[in-house]
Structures are given as C-alpha cells and as structure tokens.
Amino acid sequence: MTKSLSDLLQTNDFTRRHIGPSEAEQAEMLGVLGVSSLDELTQTTLPAAIQFDGELHTGPGMTEAQALAELKAVAQKNKVFRSYIGMGYAGTDVPPVILRNMLENPGWYTAYTPYQAEISQGRLEMLLNFQQTVQDMTGMPVSNASLLDEATAAAEAMTLAKRQSKNKGSNVFFVADNVHPQTMDVVKTRAEYFGFEVQTGSADAIPEGAFGALVQYPGTHGEVLNLAPIAEKAHTQGAALIVATDLLACALLTPPGEQGADIVVGSAQRFGVPMGFGGPHAAFLACQKGFERSMPGRVIGVSKDVRGNTALRMAMQTREQHIRREKATSNICTAQALLANMAAAYAVWHGPEGIKTIAERVHRLTGILAKALQDAGIKANETFFDTLTFEGQDDLGARAEAKGINFRLDGGKVGISLDETVTPQDLADIIEVVTGKGVDVQKLDAEAVDGIPAPLKRQSDFLTHPVFNTHHSEHGMLRYLKQLENKDYSLTHGMIPLGSCTMKLNATTEMIPVTWPEFGGLHPFAPESQTQGYAEMLAELERWLADITGYDAVSMQPNSGAQGEYAGLLVIRKYHEARGEAHRNICLIPASAHGTNPASAAMMGMQVVVVKTDEQGNIDFDDLKAQAEAHSDHLAALMITYPSTHGVYEENVRDVCDLIHQHGGQVYLDGANMNAMVGVAKPGLIGGDVSHLNLHKTFAIPHGGGGPGMGPIGVKAHLAPFLPNHAVAPTSDSHTGAVSAAPYGSASILPISYLYIKLLGAAGLRQSTQVALLNANYIAKRLSGAFPVLYSGKGGRVAHECILDIRPLKQESGVSEEDIAKRLMDYGFHAPTMSFPVPGTLMIEPTESEPKAELDRFVDAMLNIRREIQDVQDGTISAADSPLKHAPHTLKDLMDSEWTRAYSRETGAFPSAAQKAWKYWPAVNRVDNVYGDRNFVCSCPPIEDYIGA
C-alpha cells in the first residue's frame, strides 16, 4: 500500500521512540495478560468511576525538529541582558569540560538518589567533594550534600537552630535587615505554622531570648560585617547564629565558621551553574559538630565495605522523612545533587588558586567601580566584596536598559553586583551608564578601593585536599569525571525499576534547551519585558498541566515534590483561615503514605492522625470514617496517593474524597503516581482539591542522581486565591508567602516537561500511561509464580508498579530483600525500591520507556535469583555461603588469588549469559552501614584510601 504524505511526515515519530515496546511486542504482552488492546487493559484495570474517556487539550504530537524549532522561537522572546542585580544570583562561566561531560551527560543526569551505595560511588565521591568545598569555604566542620535553594536552606536552618538553641522555650527568631528579601519571605512563610515570631532589625540588634538569628555575609546591599561580635552577643543570649554567605566571597573574607557561626547556609550557584531564571542550583547547609544528627538533607559519609575498603554512602538516614516521618528533621527528599556535583567539579577544576583568582578579580573590578563612583561624588557602601549600593538617579534604569544592562532598583536605591563574567569593557559600560562619563578601567586599577577591612581578610587555606589540586588540565579533568561516571549505574546501563520513582526516558531532545542561553542566562528578578519567552512557555505549561490533572490553576513555584506537598498544605491552611476556620489542623494520612506526607503536615503545624489500611492495601474506609467523624470540627485535610502507594487503583476513591468534604476537610491527592493517570484519569475530577506533580517523574525531568526536581501544584478554583506568591517578583494578588527563593522555582528545567508534553501530544501521553500499565502488569504476571504479588486491584491487576512479597522466602531461607537487591547488581540491574511501603518487600516500576527485551532480562534475572534462593531452601548451599549473601561481586573478588567460596567465580560475577556480552561492575562490595554511622566522617578521606579501594 502506498503511503500518503501525512504518513511520511512521521508526526508521531517521538511517541514510538519514547515508548519501549514496539506495537508487535505490545500485542504479545497484551496476550500474556489476556486482553486484546491497550484500551481494554485500561478499561479492565481502572475503576469505571474514575476513567477519563475524553481527549486532552495538549495538541497533537510533533517531530523533535518541529518541537525544538517552536520552542527556540519562544526562547528568543527572552532578552538576555547583562544582569548585575545580585541578591544571591550571579553570572558564571560554566567550564565546557563540566558542561559537556556532566550537565549534558546522561551518565550523570539519569542516575537515581544514591541509596544503593555499591553502584553509586562516583557521584557519592563528587557529592563528598561538594561537602568538602562547603566546609573549606565556610570554615565549618560539617555540611550536607545540598538543599533546594538558599532561602529554603535558611528556613531549614531556622528549625535546626530551634532544635539546638539553649533558649528552648523561645519562639522568637531574628532576621537581620541585611538578608536577601526572598529569603526573608520564605523564612516568614515557614515560621508561621511552627508558631515562630520573626523579628527584624539591624544585624547587631538580636533581641534577648531569641532562639536563633540570621544575618547575611556579605549583606544584600553589599556591606561586609564583622560577625565575631554578633556571634558573641548571640551566644551570650543563648541564640544560635545562622549566617547566609557567598562561597566565592569566602575565598577572600574570613569565613563565618572562624567568626563563631553555628550554622552557615547559601547557594553554590556561582560555582559554575547558570542563573536559569531562578534555578536549579545547589544550596548548602553547614554546621558545627554536635548539630549533625538534627541537620536536614542528605549527608554523604565515609564508611567501608565488607573487604575493609573505603566506601561512601548516605549517612544517618534515620533522621530523614522516609524513616522518621512526622518526627523527621525535615520533609526534604529530592535535593540538588546534579547541581552540587557541578559546583564541586567547578572547585576541582579551578582549585584553590583558581577560585582565589576569580574572587580577587571580581573584588578588584568592584573596587574600580567604587573608585569611579567616588570620583563622581556618588556615595556607596565602604565595605564590600562584589556589590555596591547607592542612591539612584530617576533615569538610571532607562539608561541601563538602553545599554542592555540590569541593575537592582529598590526603593530609590541602586545595587550593582559584579561577577566572574564581567570584563573591563563591561565595567566601563556600567560606569558610563551610572556617571555619564567614559573611563579607562586600566588606569583606574591602581586606585581601586579595597572593600575588605584588614581584620576580615581571610588568612586560612582552603581546598587543600589533593582532589582540588590535581585535575587542572582538561585531559586530567575529563578522565576524572569519566572515572567517577564509570562507577555509577544509570539509565545508560539498564532499567532502574524503582517503585514510586518513575525512572523513565529523559529524551535527548527534551534536554537540549536546558543549556540554551535564552533560558540559562536570565536573572530571576529581571524585568518582565525581558522574560516574555519564559512567560509564554510557563503559561502554556500551566494550562496543559491544569488540563491533564483536572484542576483550575497551577503554581510552578515548588521545586521538589516534598515542597509541593508543603505548598499544597499551605494553600489548604490559608483557605480554612479565610473561612474563619483556622482551628482546622488535623491531617489524616494512611499508614502506607510516603514519609514526606506526614513530615510535610508536621511542618505545617498539623496534627497527623494515621488511618489504617486493610489487607488489600486499601484505605480502611471504616477507620477513615471513624477518624473523620471524631475529628470533624478540626479536620483540615486528608493526604492520599493515587494510585495508592501499594500500586493499585482503589475502587472507592470518590467515596473517600466525598467523606472528607462532608466533614469540611480538603483532599490532598499526592501526584507521585501520576504516571498511572495521565490521559486516563484526572485527580481534580475524582475529588482532589490539590495535588503536586513530580515533573522529575511523570514529565521526564531527569533525577540527576538526587535532584533537581520540580513539584508544581494544581488546585481547584476555590483554592486558587491562596497559591504561593513572591515578595520580590509577585505572580498574583495572593497574600500567601513564598515557598521558594525564585517565583517559578527551578525554571530552567521546565523546558524538559514542556517538550515532553509537546512531543507526545494528547494521544502519546495517554498511550505512555497505558504502556506503563502494560509493562508493570507484564512483569507482575511473569513473576507471580515465583514471588507473590502482594497487592492487586480490579481483575487482579496492578497499576504502574507492583510489590513482590519477600517475607515468606526470608522466613524460610534467611535470604532478605536486601540480598536480592544486591544480587541484582551482579545481573546488571539497579534494585527495586526496598521495604516501602511494606517492610520485607520489593516494589517494581518499569515505566513505559523500557523495551520488552529489558523487561524480559529483568524477569529472567529475578527468576534466576529465585532458583538461587531455592538452592538455599533445598539445602544445596547455606544462606551464608550463597552468592546472594556475598553480593554484589566486584572485579577485585574475581582477582583474588584464592577462591574459597562454595560457588564458582563465574556464578558470582557472571550469573547469566547477558553478563558475558556486557558487564557492569559495582565499584565496591556491600557497604557497612552501621560502621559508617558509628564512625561519622563527612569530609574527603586521604587520597590513599581511594587508591586502596
């Protein structure tokens, strides 16, 4: 049959690239399940009451070339001016060796959070480098492996200060008036529902009895304060001192840790990460020893493996939300690992001399500007690192705009912040705009003002570890990055079947715009006239997401799923308050909920009441009804995930939502599992009032080894007036405070989700969901004879993921879910999710992007492992001698001169034919978690330890 021109244009080409199984393979898999089509599978899996049979209004799919061309036209509506606005955002030069080999490299950006340490040693090492960088620059002994942004890091520091302060009975927190306004905004939002009173004033005016104080160093307007007397006063009064600082400034300034700071926060953005209209960037939090077990966020620690070799891991996880739930130190889950790795690589690339040279250049240029201002009779701050502030002339903004320049214009004041991208010509342009006179920058150099007082000049060394003093040639750096990448398992190696994580394809086309200067080069507080491309893209993306979810309004501000939960609950609280029902503070949460749910509710000052689940994994409706009735007058919300965290579509979800509404509550429908709903159901149409969406799951933003992510929220119309706003760049008339430092969160990664939707179109989005269901049910069906599938819904089907019950086998054989997870590494796989939501289980989510061959390879590996367990059950080999207990096997194991194990080397490392064609090698043997927590070290070990490993 002759193809038409329409056929030849291949407008659906991307859909078949994104979806793993071919049409023929889909037909074969559908046959295994006993259905004839994807539509039949959908209709027989989803409850009839929730099915959406219409068509999404996202348009038809298009080719990759078409989509890129259209988005490029939108991006070019942005005007990339030279922005000297500052406020925690600075221009930076991304070293090309890092840009190409890390940021644009799927070996780095498609990996998951390094819970499985044995196959994550590369990024764990770079994250440890990040921690060391932060510790060295700030002068602090302990730091974490990134937070979402500087403002939320400050808010996290506030609650850490509360836990550590000597003033246990105090609810007063002090914020100096030299703190960035967006930080002030986020801190006030966070403080409200903790019951904290935020007081402000000059940095040295810490009130008696405050539990903590936050100051900026250098200040938002550029001044450099002596922190030592402020720290002394804070400590005398029993308060913890938090300092928000600039890593580059700390190359020249006496670091906060040497002046008495208890906690130091900030952003590592100017260490080689583009501004990106607000993000993503890696924030940091460092603290004194003794604070670490209350510290928020992931911390990388040094441990050892079973052979005694140095091995890295995520340390002290018992303080995190996935274990402590509502008692966790924070609800943080996704952080900014990829951006932290970039910042660490920047420090490795430049080394101490390079970093100091950049800092000296920025300071010298600022000193020349200070001299030019003096000569023009303009009075600016006398102490500074990179920022000068002075009274402005009425027409200065217009003159700057005509020159393609942005200054900070704030209440009659003008702020100018310089950065590493500024050239002498740029500085000459700035001076001409401000003074109206041309100058010779080189001649002014000899008269440059020194803005750092002698007592505040840094004397201590930094970045002394060999890793920061070795890789300064491009070949050296290239090979170091590659060596680390080769230690890690990512989607470039195979399927990452983590349940509740949706490790789908991050298509190359979707990633391309992330590094376009039109998106990366914009300051988040640039004038609206310069950001029209972003405005157009954001408006369309918000409209699409509202349509997909069945909600009426969307906020793009939350920059993680956990922050989306927090924002959604904030909206609910504001709604109740506006109705005169501020007393509503009870949040009902099923026992099976993700740990971020109760942690987020606790952060919103809500009392968590746990609802039972039944033997099928569903919400116990009788218990829910009893709890709703018992707490009716104070019921604020129910938080549920749909499909449930047990991987099934609960039949009575509409009844559940109706019950909550009858008692005056709102329904927070967690969108973590939205990959099972797009195009086939809408949370806003089944009773949800608000949901967050994990764009780094459902909408193809890569996980980055632990971030970035985005967690926008959709709400019904009655909640729309209460969406988060922003003090610096208002997005609405809402009086709700900000939850992120930037008004649109991590805006520069939103083009990924935009292209994902545009490329697939309405039909492709629906088909992707259907194939996600197909792949999960295919795996469940093939494995059900070997491992019990714990929960299933209508017709014995699962949703987009399935849970295998390992507990009976563990009881009979002594082989645990952890043993299976580690053994899968020998077969060339990342482990499924372990012991969530049920201890002793494995939760598998293959996503729609995995081809049938990969699904079969995984099933075959699991069936082989089941046979290995059977050998233990039959007494052929003891559990202790089994390859399952010794997994994973490394190349060093095979190189041992003596092999005394009860199985062959080949059985250990090459358990199936697939490994003989291609083999992924774990970098270390099983890591000793207990040793790592008992001997906590979160800085870089001696280089000899790496060599020994």
Curated annotation (Swiss-Prot):
What cellular-component terms does GO give this entry? cytosol; glycine cleavage complex
Xref: CDD domains: GDC-P (cd00613)
| Residues the record lists as N6-(pyridoxal phosphate)lysine modifications | K697
MF annotations from Gene Ontology: glycine binding; glycine dehydrogenase (decarboxylating) activity; pyridoxal phosphate binding
Tell me its EC number(s), please. Answer: 1.4.4.2
Keyword vocabulary terms for this entry: Oxidoreductase, Pyridoxal phosphate
Enzyme class comes to oxidoreductase
What this chain does, per the entry, is described as:
The glycine cleavage system catalyzes the degradation of glycine. The P protein binds the alpha-amino group of glycine through its pyridoxal phosphate cofactor; CO(2) is released and the remaining methylamine moiety is then transferred to the lipoamide cofactor of the H protein.
- How is the subunit organization of this protein annotated in UniProt? The glycine cleavage system is composed of four proteins: P, T, L and H.
- Give the record's family classification: Belongs to the GcvP family.
Protein known as: Glycine dehydrogenase (decarboxylating)
Q: What is the lineage of its organism?
A: Bacteria, Thermotogati, Deinococcota, Deinococci, Deinococcales
